[in-house]
């Protein structure tokens, strides 16, 4: 792997490093049951596939899709409860990184590249995932939309690059927002479409990516 083409890797989290569905789906169903029990929302529960479809979206988009017609108060409560239920699921040992992620990050880090996370997720969740799997130390910076109050991935990545003086590198993700953020900020975009795992986007979302990978380990050779 050569530094001639970049100095840093900026990773999305959900669907890129972490198998989000193993935590977010059961956590959401816990949240939905609590909302119904408290009389805060009586709509039908979304299917697992509908829950998966919101991964990577900003909070407004998430709740408009999963709880259409819900009050702002109910959406705020649901957002807080879902976060807590996700953290509880992580504490219970749920969830997994994609194969090769932990070793791959270590290899890239040891070769002198700076690693970052840029996620639309909430900060406690993002940091909770990285901490639960012991990979926080590989990252120079961890950027989440909520913590930075920047609910646009193009701007979130731009802020990250400005604050850490990143002039070139790679954007690695699985959604169209990752492709757009990378392109908008002059990064080489690597789209993740892992073979044998659920995809949270349709095939068109990664159009425009410079490279596509079917496993995380491919990143070690493609970025060279």
PLM region spans:
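Conserved Lys-Pro-Asp/Glu-containing loop-to-beta segment of HAD-superfamily phosphomonoesterases
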Residues: 152-179
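A short, structured active-site edge motif that brings together acidic residues
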Residues: 51, 135-151
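N-terminal helical cap/lid subdomain that shapes the substrate entry/recognition surface
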Residues: 4-99
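Acidic, Mg2+-coordinating phosphoryl-transfer loop and its flanking beta/alpha structural elements
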Residues: 171-211
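Glycine-rich phosphate-binding loop signature in dinucleotide/nucleotide-binding domains
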Residues: 2-4, 110-113, 163-167
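Conserved phosphate-coupling serine/threonine residues in phosphotransfer and NTP-handling enzymes
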Residues: 16, 119-121
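Short, acidic loop-to-helix structural element flanking the phosphoryl-transfer center
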Residues: 88-117, 127, 154
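Surface-exposed amphipathic alpha-helices with a cationic face
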Residues: 102-110, 161, 179-183
């Amino acid at each position: 792997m050569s530094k001639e083409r970049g100095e840093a890797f900026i990773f999305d989290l959900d669907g890129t490093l972490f198998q989000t569905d193993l935590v977010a789906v059961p956590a959401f169903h816990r949240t939905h049951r609590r909302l119904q029990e408290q009389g805060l929302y009586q709509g039908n529960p979304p299917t697992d596939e509908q829950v998966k479809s919101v991964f990577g979206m900003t909070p407004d988009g998430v709740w408009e899709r999963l709880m259409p017609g819900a009050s702002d108060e109910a959406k705020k409560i649901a957002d807080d409860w879902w976060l807590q239920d996700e953290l509880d699921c992580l504490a219970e040992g749920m969830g997994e990184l994609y194969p090769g992620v932990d070793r791959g990050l270590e290899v890239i880090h040891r070769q002198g590249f700076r690693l970052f996370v840029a996620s639309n997720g909430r900060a406690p969740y993002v940091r909770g995932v990285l901490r639960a799997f012991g990979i926080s130390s590989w990252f120079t910076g961890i950027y989440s939309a909520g913590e930075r109050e920047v609910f646009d991935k193009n701007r979130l990545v731009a802020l990250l690059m400005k604050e850490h003086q990143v002039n070139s590198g790679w954007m690695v993700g699985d959604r169209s927002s990752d492709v757009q953020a990378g392109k908008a900020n002059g990064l080489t975009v690597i789209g993740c479409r892992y073979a044998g795992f659920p995809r949270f986007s349709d095939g068109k979302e990664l159009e425009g990516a410079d490279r596509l990978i079917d496993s995380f380990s491919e990143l070690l050779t493609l970025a060279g």
